[in-house]
UniProtKB/Swiss-Prot annotation:
It comes from Streptococcus salivarius (strain JIM8777). Gene3D superfamilies: SecY subunit domain. Belongs to the SecY/SEC61-alpha family. SecY2 subfamily. The keyword Protein transport applies. GO terms for biological process: intracellular protein transmembrane transport; protein targeting. This is Accessory Sec system protein translocase subunit SecY2. Pfam families: SecY (PF00344). The keyword Ion transport does not apply. It is a multi-pass membrane protein. Component of the accessory SecA2/SecY2 protein translocase complex required to export cell wall proteins. May form heterotrimers with SecE and SecG subunits.
Amino acid sequence: MKKISQSIITKRVLWTLFFLFIYCLGNQLVLPFVDLKNANIFGGAIGSLAFSSAMMGGNLRSMSLFSVGLSPWMSAMILWQMFSFSKKMGLKNLPIEIQDRRRMYLALGIAIVQSLAVSLNLPIVSGVNASLAIFMNTILLIAGTFFLVWLSDLNSLFGIGGSIVILMASMMANLPYQIMDSIEKLGIGWNVLLPLILFSLVFLYVSGVVQRARYRISINKINIHNRFKQYSYLDIMLNPAGGMPFMYAMSLVSIPQYVFMLIQFIHPENKWTSGAIKALTVGQPLWLVVYLVMLFVLGLAFAFVNVSGEQISERMRKSGEYIYGVYPGQETSAYINHLVLRLGFIGALYMLFMAGAPMLIILVNPDYLQLSMIPGTFLIFSGMIYNVNEEMKALKLNTSYTPLFENV
């Protein structure tokens, strides 16, 4: 049994490595007709979006097939979740196939806007029809996004981690560059660097502790002996939203900038679009306010997405379980949702303190932008590693049992 389990894990790890190889290969496929020698290729709006793109599996610095990354798909997922809370729209009552199709349509719409905005702001080599180059690059960027979605689905089926692995690879490829670039720009010496390293280690420890912290609710289960009562419980994370709000907030906040970039190209005479793009550029005060508000809202929203009182209550009702002192059904659902609201509020404040507070330094010096985002990146990274580790534990579960007739 142990050999079989190890074989399954090995196969899944090899598949994941293969998918990562394809992802790295795609990052080397440069978009056609782009003037890479242009000094302003990473400047302006494109340069400001490079960091947020890297958080979502993209790489605007490479100007490759995967430059937009999974941002449209991730934005579509969170928007669909928000629409699903509306009972009037009745999205939850639709068949799964229709829901998936409409989510993809939403992702396609966002991908068109983002890809077109990027293509319109790329420097084109001389002697090439600009309209043709923009059209081809837009189509390639959209195709790259949906190829990454397909690759993530394949990794979920055959590998380990799903889309998380793609995002981790993108972050690991860009984080060292961002750190070194900031250190060189700011001229940071070891007298500042050593305290930063120590702070990072403490931050990782705290984030690991919070990631594992649970609130346990005692549950009465049918046909369970009283001596196992202490093991019968429902646990909810202290931070039910996890580290995902940081990444999704980055994705949602970047959408208006893409839209304004598109409007500016269509109507260049409108001066207000330039002001809007500048105000929503990563690191600007307005961007910071919008980002922190979005971070808090998503911290609460993801808590209810990850822990649904209605679903847990329905599952407990069908299995005959109940919470001590709480009636099954609607009362159980309300009890869990109230608890999730409290924990979600604590988690949202934790996100603001750990990932948002360090970014306030950019109001003093915008050059600290990349360094100020490192705590939030670590927060995402620790959550991703935890999820992958839990998946590995589930795959290894069979090794904890021995065959019934092994010694016969």
